[in-house]
Amino acid sequence: MGIDISCLNFIASHKQYVKGKTLQIGRQGLHYAGSWADRSGKKAIISNKILSDHNINFTAQDTVEGGDGHTEKLFKLLGADTVDTIDYSPYEGCTIVHDMNKPVDEIYHDAFDYILDAGTIEHIYDVKTVIDNYKIMLKVGGTIAIITTCNNFAGHGFYQFSPEFFRTVFSKQAGYQQLGLDIYELTSDESFEAYHIAEPRKGDRQEFKTSPNPHYVAFVAKKIKNIDSSNFQQSDYLKVWGEL
């Protein structure tokens, strides 16, 4: 797992929400800064432009220096006070060992101001429990950001996700304010196109035809209040059933 240039752009686009107690779902590597042998290479140049375009006053190289190839320094430079990582195994140096197929311990309830999943959820079997864990670990007023596989990643993980999934499970009715929903088309290892997904008319189905390139879905939302919401239906079917 790691932060590539498209993930960096996504994080930079909502940088103001990275603060306080931050949690990574799986420890993230620095994939955007180029190789360790050439930190001034093309990826680093592109990454620096992304940071500059989002009015961020440090460089990709700053996030690498003095670190071990992971993203804790990036998040602290963005504004996090502490950065924890939860993972199934300690093999990559996580601070919390937990199987996300199971509910998290109460000590992690309402514990974090910012949670980032950058490519983990698609590898976990029990997606409902994963989402429930994210919700219960996030403080009211905190922000959840998820970037995961959307299309042309068959075989990468267990799942690929539709934008509709995140829009539904983190809806206003579930206690969240949507801050951003995008699709990232990976046109090469060093380039991407980002497409903002507008809110559809109530109950309308929103389908997307994509190119043969791999695509991520990227979603960010703010938790407004705690609501016990665990049963969701797709909005266009609710419209058909007369329940919207």
Spans of features found by a protein language model:
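Short alpha-helical segments and helix-capping/turn motifs at coil-helix boundaries
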Residues: 3-12, 67-71, 203-205
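Short, glycine/acidic-enriched capping/hinge loops at junctions between secondary-structure elements
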Residues: 34-38, 96, 232
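Class I SAM-dependent methyltransferase Rossmann-like catalytic core
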Residues: 1-20, 29-42
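Conserved SAM-binding loop
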Residues: 23-25, 66-155
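S-adenosyl-L-methionine-dependent methyltransferase catalytic module, highlighting the catalytic core
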Residues: 64-65, 76-78, 125-244
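Flexible, charged surface loops at secondary-structure boundaries
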Residues: 13-20, 77, 108-109, 213
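Residue-level detector of flexible, active-site-proximal loop/helix-junction positions
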Residues: 29, 90-92, 102, 183-188
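Aromatic- and Gly/Pro-rich amphipathic surface segment
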Residues: 31-85
